[in-house]
């Protein structure tokens, strides 16, 4: 019985390092200090969206590649890819949905304890109540669905990178970067143009189905090699 814990942990670390420690601070804290970048961001929104999508693809997919290439030399089976993707997508879900849930829990606990006079996370009691009431069953289900679809997409991208490494096909890294960028760019365009989460979810569902098919095909190839 194989132990997939290392693959899971490396997957989580890759997301944390590439996004939380590198890409986001670089964009939000370093590049914003340059006037040329702020002009680009303000006057060329379409190009900026494409830039964000490409950088997300480059950082995350190169991170996956380095993770398998350098630290998982003896952990390159199909199950390792699944574990890596679960760690990668899991830490993302924790940092995105988890923090939001914790935020709402703090508000709820303060309201239940009768904290009506002080502030709750910088808001007065009425503002906190409005913020908490804005969270409904539909929004919770939407977040849950979005995270599941994102996990499937992470799985597909991980398998593409792992397949490229295992079978010495370096161009598969470029394919993963391109697919990642396309997914993110279209999500941003749909969200900004249509302003509806419904169509964003539809697009993510389509992508998830495609990546499921890709994952199944790669699984068949992996098990033929066993």
Give, region by region, the residue ranges found by the protein language model:
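Hydrophobic alpha-helical segments at protein termini of multi-pass membrane proteins
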Residues: 1-226
């Amino acid at each position: 019985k194989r132990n997939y814990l290392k693959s899971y942990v490396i997957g989580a670390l890759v997301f944390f390092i590439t996004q939380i420690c590198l890409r986001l601070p670089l964009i939000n804290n370093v590049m914003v200090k340059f006037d040329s970048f702020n002009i680009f961001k303000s006057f060329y929104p379409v190009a900026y969206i494409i830039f964000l999508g490409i950088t997300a693809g480059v950082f995350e997919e190169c991170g996956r590649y380095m993770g398998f290439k350098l630290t998982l030399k003896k952990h390159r089976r199909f199950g390792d890819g699944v574990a890596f993707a679960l760690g990668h997508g899991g830490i993302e879900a924790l940092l995105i949905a988890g923090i939001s849930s914790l935020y709402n829990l703090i508000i709820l606990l303060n309201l239940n304890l009768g904290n009506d006079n002080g502030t709750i996370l910088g808001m007065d009691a009425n503002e906190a109540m409005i913020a908490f009431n804005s969270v409904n069953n539909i929004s919770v289900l939407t977040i849950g669905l979005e995270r599941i679809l994102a996990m499937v997409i992470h799985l597909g991208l991980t398998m593409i990178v792992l397949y490229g490494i295992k079978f010495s096909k370096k161009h598969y890294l470029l394919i993963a970067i391109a697919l990642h960028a396309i997914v993110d760019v279209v999500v941003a365009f749909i969200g900004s143009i249509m302003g509806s989460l419904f169509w964003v979810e539809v697009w993510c569902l389509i992508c998830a189905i495609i990546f499921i098919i890709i994952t199944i095909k790669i699984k068949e190839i992996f098990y033929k090699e066993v």
